Amino acid sequence: MRPFKFFTSLAMAVTLAFAVSSPVRAAYPEKPVNLIIAFTAGGSSDVQARIMQKYWNKYVKQRWVFVYKPGAGGMIGFTEIAKASKDGYTFGGMNLPHMVLQELSQKAAFTSDSYEYLAQVVNDPQCVAVLKTSRFKNFKEILDFAKSNPNKLKVGLVGPLSGHHLMYLEFCKLFPEAKITKVFYKGAADQNAALLGGEVDLIFGNINDIMRSISEFRILNVASEKRNAFLPDVPTLKEQGINLVSDIRRIFACPKGTDPEAVRFLRVTLKKICSDPDYLEDMKKAGQPAEYLDPASLEAYIRSLEVVDKKLLQENGLIK
């Protein structure tokens, strides 16, 4: 074989081999991308993702296909994300600290190392809410009643092993003499419906979910360091002398080992969306507290949660 012909054939072979072995090409995405939502339709995670989809469509031709996998405080959906195809055509929305709590409990089929982290998009403080017709006008009245009437009150939580559950555990640690029965729901839409229907007396939930029923709910306190811009007239728990700060963060991730080109594209596009002024305005209108974290900062935050939350779970006998 002549030298020129040999090297030409070799180059063609290498090019062909690369094309066959690479699952993602320059045209990614070439088809719709599946987005797994680990909670019920209509909940805060779904609402946020729908807003983000609008701006994904602004920058990307291929649309999202929403896949709902609710239940077990998000664990079912988080598992689906971890086990999804690594071709770049499936990623999902996840919640913190839910994912970390479930990992630490040793009941999950995933760990924090099961994912490629793409972005944090929301930091949503939690709050305490009752019906407007409730006898309780402030959190102290709830505490006093719970102390005198153990387990008579019911609190609705999304869970188990969710941010709502964590806030409940922190509450129990601060006030061991105040006994309140916990009731778990698959998602925030179910949780809100339970309070509206009288199944529970109060709920611990994130601001965005609760604000969607604000005409019928009374928000007693916010579990944040300072008053929230969406609820400027509602005092923090700290203002009431209760040292409890709790939030739920929404992030996006795909399975560990997903094609690097797809991961890069998703990270760049989500960051672009999160800095779009129109997106931020839509998030504000929807009561969604937007807060972007890049993948490295997000992973560092997750590692810090693993240390702090492990101790609380151990104290409650939820892990060894």
Outline where the language-model segments fall.
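Bacterial N-terminal signal peptides
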Residues: 8-19
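Hinge/capping helix and adjacent helix->loop/strand transition within the periplasmic-binding protein
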Residues: 56, 80-90, 103-190, 242, ...
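Positively charged n-region of N-terminal signal peptides that target proteins for export
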Residues: 1-6
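Sec/Tat signal peptide C-region and signal peptidase I cleavage site
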Residues: 20-26
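N-terminal (or domain-start) structured segment
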Residues: 26-114, 152, 160, 164, ...
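Short beta-strand->loop
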Residues: 111-121, 180-183, 201, 210, ...
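An extracytoplasmic/periplasmic, membrane-proximal ligand-sensing/linker region
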Residues: 30-32, 173-177, 258-320
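Short secondary-structure boundary segments
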Residues: 95-96, 132, 206-208, 224-225, ...
